[in-house]
Amino acid sequence: MRKQATAIWTAWAALLFLRCAAWAEDRKPAWTLGLFVENDVFALSDGGYTNGVKLVWVSSGLGDGPGKGRVPRWLDTMSRKLTPSRTPDRRRFVSVALGQSMFTPEDILRKDLVRNDRPYAGYSYAALGLHRATPASMESFELDIGIVGPESFAGDIQQFLHRVFNWSYPEGWANQLKDELALGVAYDHKWKVLPAGKAGEGNWDLITHAGGMASNVFTGAAGGIEFRLGRHLPDDFGTALIGPGGDSASLFDGTAPRLPGRGNFGFHVFAALEGHAVARDIFLDGNTFRRSHRVDKLPFTVDIAAGIAVRHGRLKASLAYVYQTKRFKGQELKPLLGSLNIAVLF
């Protein structure tokens, strides 16, 4: 089973690399490669949602006719059916992502099962996103497939990194959730409330969003708001955390660049608030079809983020600190983590 999982994830990574290399041959219009890294080490802690990594490729704007986009014909056809461009200012995009998330109890030095804390859990996944956007709003549809459990290799990776960097060694991964195939669909809608002008116009804006996901990993709804203030605000839809629809933060098109003129410089600070209504969370509720450790999750949670973003030429980077309310009953510490996002236009 371990060899089969290795082959599957290697094939996914190779496919992503080869397709990106092929699409890069034609530089007009442009596409974007984004890297999301979230870790509690930025907040000098270790436990809870301890690490998340996501590599995202986002296409350029696709044409309305079959085969006009720089993606495989079947994917372009799917995008046209699910996200039709009915108005001249509406553009379609496709995204492909590979990601992994890790969860541990606060005391990672214990080898026994920590019954009053969340279970060890790892999740590795691939995601296909279809997006349609106007200058003032964007919709995202996403399909996720992955695996929870030892075959996600999250435990192996954390133990390896802690050994290499001589950090406190996580001893309890033998108690992690069992292997489970993960399938899910998600929807997210973002709106630029004020102002919704052309790229680079104005020194501030306000972005709201609402959406939800249905899967055996996570089922629930979310909504939030982000305020941005700075110089030459980018023509995108905010700085997202890892999650369904988060790929859209990397959307970047040569016909509507985040900044007027690729050599210009811009920066801004931002603050965001997001609330969640949680029906299911496998990382707290435990495995869906097998007995495993679980805790009593809280049905409503909140994330508060603040950070800074800079953009120069083809590169955009942002760094945020995120405060999370407690996720389950009896949780002693409120989670803190840092979120780094780097996006490059090709």
Language model: regions and residue ranges:
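Transmembrane beta-barrel strands of outer-membrane/channel proteins
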Residues: 33-39, 94-102, 143-149, 208-216, ...
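Short loop/turn motifs that connect adjacent beta-strands in outer-membrane beta-barrel proteins
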Residues: 24-30, 61-92, 133-140, 193-206, ...
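Residue-level signature of outer-membrane beta-barrel architecture
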Residues: 57-59, 100, 130-132, 189-193, ...
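Short glycine/proline- and aromatic-enriched beta-strand/turn motifs that initiate or cap beta-hairpins
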Residues: 25-65, 93-108, 278-284, 297
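Outer membrane beta-barrel transmembrane domains
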Residues: 106-110, 226, 232-346
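Extracellular loop and loop/strand-boundary signature of outer-membrane beta-barrel proteins
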Residues: 112-116, 169-175, 211, 290-294, ...
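Long, hydrophobic/aromatic-enriched structural stretches that serve as scaffold segments
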Residues: 77-156
